[in-house]
Amino acid sequence: MAERPRDRLGRPLPIDTAPEDAAPPVIDVTGLDDNAVWAVALDYLDRGMPFHAHEVFEQRWRSASGPEKDAWRALAQWGAALTHAERGNDEGARRLAERALETLESASAVPTCVDAPRVRASCDGLSADPD
């Protein structure tokens, strides 16, 4: 059964949506190394598809073992925060960004390919008081 089409922010579209009107499916990153997973997720972010980046990070988090697992979880939370922000859910974005920061800070290891300062700055911006 084919996966339901989605928009660039991961929202489901009608089943009969033309392929050119839907976002491409999220690629399977099984078997890719950390550098490639990070690069795929950043490409999605650069193309305005934070939901896809979240899904890539979540794939890695769920399959990871060892000291970097929590860092991948933090990245999945960051991707979700960015998705909520793009959807206009500022409160959800704030909460997820705060959770991502906490998870990243408590991670026992962060993959060397991850630009942790970029992630922290982004999360800080999302969790800042809008007033």
Sequence positions of predicted segments:
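Short secondary-structure subsegments characteristic of cysteine-rich extracellular domains
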Residues: 77-78, 85-89
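Residue-level signature for tetratricopeptide repeat
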Residues: 43-44, 76, 83
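Hydrophobic/aromatic-rich, well-ordered segments within soluble, folded domains that form packed cores
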Residues: 49, 79-80
